[in-house]
Curated annotation (Swiss-Prot):
GO biological process: translation
Organism: Desulfotalea psychrophila (strain LSv54 / DSM 12343)
Alphabetical list of PANTHER family matching this protein: LARGE RIBOSOMAL SUBUNIT PROTEIN BL27M, RIBOSOMAL PROTEIN L27
Keyword annotations: Ribonucleoprotein, Ribosomal protein
Listed Gene3D superfamilies: 2.40.50.100
Protein name as it appears in the record: Large ribosomal subunit protein bL27
């Protein structure tokens, strides 16, 4: 009789979908009130002027304007939205 030993089973073979985090609006871009600026885990970037922080640390614009990234402190960043100069 022909015999074939059973093959092992692989423990790989799964891959989760990415969570689409990151910067959604970059410096100098015009934004509307409510636009999401950054999706992040924790405050990698802090909210600045006219920027709100959601429950999951999502940063969003509170007014219509232009995005500006700023350094503050020794090694921290914040994002602000300033009214566009008409």
């Amino acid at each position: 009789m022909a015999h074939k030993k059973a093959g092992g089973s692989s423990r790989n073979g799964r891959d989760s979908a990415g969570q689409r985090r990151g910067v959604k609006k970059f410096g100098g871009e015009p934004v509307r009130s409510g636009n999401i600026l950054i999706r992040q885990l924790g405050t990698k970037v802090h909210p600045g002027t006219n920027v709100g922080c959601g429950r999951d640390y999502t940063l969003f614009a509170k007014i219509d304007g232009v995005v500006k990234f700023e350094d503050f402190g020794k090694n921290k960043k914040r994002v602000s939205v300033y009214p566009a100069a008409e």
